[in-house]
């Protein structure tokens, strides 16, 4: 199946499940989910697969491993709503745990969409290794960041930071923010002008993913340096 854009029915399903968030409603509308949500998400993944393999030949691309499950795990949360009203795709190395992983993501919700690259949550060991690299080779780290052309691609750096972490004197001013990060993710400033219904959506996402590949490999290097 070719990706032709996410149909309006995808977002409509999310809105409907938000207001009828129960198992009986989902079972009555399972065919809608399969047709209007699951199928276009799988086509989206397949369309991006060659680019993701060019970034990392070990990238997990099986749709059932990449797509978030619509059914929520409610065992440890106060919100007992059984279903999500949005979905996301994660591209990360096959066989690695999600928590603390280095990954690319795409998310679609009734309120909009977003995508980018970075870490899934906090990974203190990995970020400590990145901090040591910033201290040891600030020019090298800066060069990697420059290769991503964040300004030209209108990308923003996000992530929670340590508020009281002492930054070594040798860290350049432009890397102090990076040094203090507890996690890191890069995403577009805005996706409001991008048409979610267009088959060209994958082209835009692919361009951004490829532009962020130097950062992906910088983070992968830190991830792989974590002691066993």
Short names for language-model regions:
Residues 1-27, 185-186, 195-199, 222-227:
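Short, charged, low-complexity amphipathic alpha-helix
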Residues 15-70:
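Active-site acidic/histidine clusters and adjacent loop/turn architecture
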Residues 42, 46, 139, 206, ...:
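Generic structural signal for well-ordered, non-transmembrane alpha-helical segments
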Residues 57, 63, 69-93, 99, ...:
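Soluble extramembrane domains of integral membrane proteins
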Residues 70, 88, 168-176:
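Aromatic/basic-lined ligand-recognition segments
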Residues 75-135:
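Aromatic- and glycine-enriched beta-alpha-beta binding-site module
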Residues 110-169:
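Compact, glycine/acidic-enriched structural inserts
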Residues 188-228:
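C-terminal edge-of-domain segments
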């Amino acid at each position: 199946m070719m990706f032709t854009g996410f149909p309006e029915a995808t977002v409509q399903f999310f809105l409907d499940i938000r207001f009828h968030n129960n198992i009986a409603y989902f079972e009555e509308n399972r065919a809608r989910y399969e047709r209007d949500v699951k199928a276009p998400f799988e086509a989206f993944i397949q369309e991006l697969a060659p680019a993701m393999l060019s970034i990392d030949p070990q990238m997990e691309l099986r749709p059932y491993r990449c797509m978030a499950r619509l059914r929520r795990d409610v065992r440890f949360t106060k919100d007992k709503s059984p279903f999500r009203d949005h979905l996301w795709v994660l591209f990360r190395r096959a066989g690695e745990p999600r928590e603390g992983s280095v990954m690319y993501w795409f998310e679609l919700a009734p309120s909009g969409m977003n995508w980018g690259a970075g870490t899934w949550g906090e990974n203190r060991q990995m970020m400590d290794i990145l901090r040591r690299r910033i201290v040891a080779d600030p020019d090298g780290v800066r060069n990697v960041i420059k290769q991503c052309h964040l300004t030209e691609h209108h990308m923003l750096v996000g992530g929670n930071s340590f508020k009281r972490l002492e930054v070594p004197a040798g860290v350049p001013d432009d890397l102090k923010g990076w040094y203090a990060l507890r996690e890191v993710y890069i995403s577009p400033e805005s996706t409001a002008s991008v048409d979610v219904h267009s088959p060209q959506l994958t082209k835009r996402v692919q361009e951004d993913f490829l532009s962020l590949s130097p950062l992906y490999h910088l983070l992968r290097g830190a991830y792989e340096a974590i002691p066993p």
